[in-house]
Amino acid sequence: MRHGHGLRKLNRTSSHRLAMLQNMMNSLIEHEVIKTTVPKAKELRRVIEPMITLAKKPTVANKRLAFDRLRDRDSVVKLFGELGPRFAARPGGYTRILKMGFRVGDNAPMALVELVDRPEIKEEAAEQGAAE
């Protein structure tokens, strides 16, 4: 019996689905905000939250587990060097999903996935431009 197993299938094979989620995790860690469909965003949240929790304790074993799941050295470095300490006091809920309406081509519901305490770059750039 299949009592509530695993992730949504998202109309993909298991290898494609895992690779897609891995790429989305790397993109979210690198850019701290990505645009995707709502079902993909909800699945991304389920896999990225434990990764950030793992990064709060920077042991060698945790870094190896993170590299095993991400397969990107730069993402692991940023995860443990920047995101882990940033979310050290937060007991979960590291991501925010904002619904953005529907995609033009196929009317798919779109969402913005972002890390909650990310620094605002646009405001800093506007202040620097005004100061000059």
UniProtKB/Swiss-Prot annotation:
Keywords: Ribonucleoprotein, Ribosomal protein. The keyword Lyase does not apply. Pfam families: Ribosomal_L17. GO terms for molecular function: structural constituent of ribosome. Coiled coil: none annotated. It comes from the Bacteria. GO terms for biological process: translation. GO terms for cellular component: cytosolic large ribosomal subunit. Belongs to the bacterial ribosomal protein bL17 family. PANTHER family: LARGE RIBOSOMAL SUBUNIT PROTEIN BL17M, RIBOSOMAL PROTEIN L17. HAMAP family: Ribosomal_bL17. Part of the 50S ribosomal subunit. Contacts protein L32. NCBIfam families: L17 (TIGR00059). This is Large ribosomal subunit protein bL17.
